[in-house]
A protein has these predicted regions:
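Short alpha-helical transmembrane segments in multi-pass integral membrane proteins
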Residues: 1-20, 78-143, 187-243, 299-366, ...
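Residue-level signal for short hydrophobic patches within transmembrane helices
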Residues: 9, 13-32, 36, 59, ...
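Transmembrane helical elements of multi-pass membrane transporters/channels
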Residues: 18-37, 139, 150, 173, ...
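Generic alpha-helical transmembrane segments of integral inner-membrane proteins
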Residues: 24, 28, 32, 36, ...
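Helix-terminus/linker motif at the lipid-water interface of multi-pass membrane proteins
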Residues: 28, 32-50, 120-127, 183-190, ...
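Small-residue hotspots at the loop-to-helix junctions and early N-terminal turns
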Residues: 47-58, 137, 196, 268-283, ...
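Small-residue-rich hydrophobic transmembrane alpha-helices
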Residues: 50-110, 147-166, 273-337, 370-392
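Short runs within selected transmembrane alpha-helices of multi-pass transporters and secretion channels
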Residues: 71, 139-158, 166-174, 195-210, ...
Length: 449
């Protein structure tokens, strides 16, 4: 009998796409949280506020990546147990993960409130936007508990094959976010603080909704009294996956943060261009990023169920799908780079538009590289090799950071040199990841024979 959310049966390509589509839409809505702030702030307040929100978003993603990494790693464990049909281990891992990530959330919150000022100074945030950026982040982190709750339960539901339910709660919260943005900024004139407050309240709605749904509609995922224990084997498994995935996410966002610091040194105009272009960039490769996450769940469930033949067929199918889609998006972004920048920037801000268009055309030409890299990350996490995902992340980000600082320092490089360092990092990690997959695939098949 086919279980709800079972990814070990059915056609591979159809199963992957059916599972991925709600995740893509959900990620689109997640991006809309910050896009709503960026769009309204940029058009209604000005370039300084746009630069503040854009830089704040980069720092916010880096800090929250700790929680997202823990949730993602736990989700892999959930998928393995669900695929194997071990519901006792599944419930115990849910309880242990919830407590672990909850404690980390509290620690992170306290750390941000204590060290936010020194962090902003370390990032060379210009004085004219320092106050706006500080107040924005302070409000955002007052609601970090909502970020933890939503992402934990969304990860849990996706791990057991339900990618639709998290989408519904996000849809409601995004509509609320945009409405509150307009009300707080245009009607109450709260400025950048209003944008932050709107995001926190909207995330609170999503968090409350998803936790109520899970407890009422998915009783098999609700832990019982006997599950409320810290089993050593369970904790070791969660720690192994979650810690390495957390390290991967943190390293990834640390590299981005270091590049943000370098970009900040070029002034407010370049910061504003980077903030707007990164939002467009995130939307452009967001579908293949979510496809990689869905692919990871697919692989993990089949790995837990021992369906190794299905895993290898899934790899081939996913690779072709990701490459075709990435090439299509590359063409669209390259052709429409300037109109896309005008969504966030006023037409008279020509310097910002020119810098942003250059960024988009360089990155857009290589979306195939990041698409393949997301598949490699997901594959290695799912087959109990999260360490390899970390290696690829360090390789990609390390190359990116070293090259960006070097190219920015030479006369021929400058800001454009920073942009070129990003796809070069993707491609180097792709080559290593694919080579190791081909080697490991042979060993993997041999060991399971």
């Amino acid at each position: 009998m086919l279980r709800k959310g079972d990814l070990t049966q059915g056609g591979i390509t159809g199963t992957l796409l059916h599972f991925t589509l709600p995740m893509m839409v959900g990620s689109f809505l997640q991006q809309c949280y910050n896009i709503a702030d960026t769009l309204i702030v940029g058009q209604c307040i000005g370039a300084g506020a746009l630069a503040a929100v854009g830089s704040a978003y980069t720092l916010m993603v880096f800090l929250i990546s700790v929680l997202l990494g823990l949730a993602m790693g736990s989700g892999t464990v959930f998928s393995l147990h669900y695929g194997a049909g071990n519901h006792v281990a599944l419930r115990r891992s849910i309880f242990s993960s919830f407590v672990l990530i909850g404690i980390v959330t509290l620690i992170l919150n306290v750390a941000v409130f204590i060290w936010l000022g020194p962090i902003l100074r370390l990032l060379q945030v210009p004085q004219d936007i320092y106050g706006m950026m500080r107040s924005y982040l302070w409000i955002i982190f007052c609601g970090i508990v909502f970020t933890f709750i939503y992402n934990f339960y969304a990860s849990l539901l996706r791990a057991v094959g339900d990618s639709v339910t998290p989408l519904w709660f996000l849809a409601v919260s995004v509509v609320l976010n945009i409405a509150l943005d307009l009300f707080f900024i245009l009607q109450l004139d709260w400025g950048i603080q209003g944008a932050a407050a709107a995001t926190v309240l909207a995330q609170g709605v999503a968090a409350l909704g998803i936790i109520i749904y899970t407890y009422r509609r998915r009783p098999e995922l609700r832990w019982h009294h006997e599950d409320m224990c810290f089993d050593r084997t369970c904790l070791k498994e969660i720690a192994s996956f979650s810690t390495l995935t957390c390290v991967q996410q943190s390293v990834m966002n640390l590299g981005i943060l270091m590049i943000q610091g370098l970009v900040n040194s070029f002034g407010t105009a370049v910061m504003a261009a980077f903030a707007a272009a990164v939002k467009i960039d995130s939307f452009a490769y967001m579908p293949v990023q979510e496809f990689g996450n869905a692919f990871s769940t697919f692989i993990a469930q089949n790995f837990g169920a021992g369906r190794y033949d299905r895993i290898h067929r899934g790899v081939r199918s996913a690779f072709v799908t990701a490459v075709v889609f990435s090439l299509l998006v590359s063409v669209l972004v390259f052709v429409f780079a300037e109109p896309l920048m005008l969504i966030f920037v006023r037409p008279d801000e020509t310097e910002i538009i020119a810098v942003g268009v250059t960024y988009l055309r360089i990155e857009g030409a290589f979306y195939c590289g990041i698409g393949i890299l997301f598949l490699l990350y997901g594959y290695y996490r799912a087959i109990r090799m999260p360490g390899m995902s970390v290696v690829l992340t360090v390789l990609s980000l390390g190359t990116r950071v070293v090259l960006s600082y070097w190219l920015a320092s030479v006369p021929e490089g400058g800001v454009t040199g920073i942009w070129w360092s990003i796809p070069i990092g993707w491609l180097i990690a792709d080559v290593v990841g694919i080579w190791y997959y081909r080697y490991k695939k042979f060993r993997f098949q041999e060991s399971k024979a």
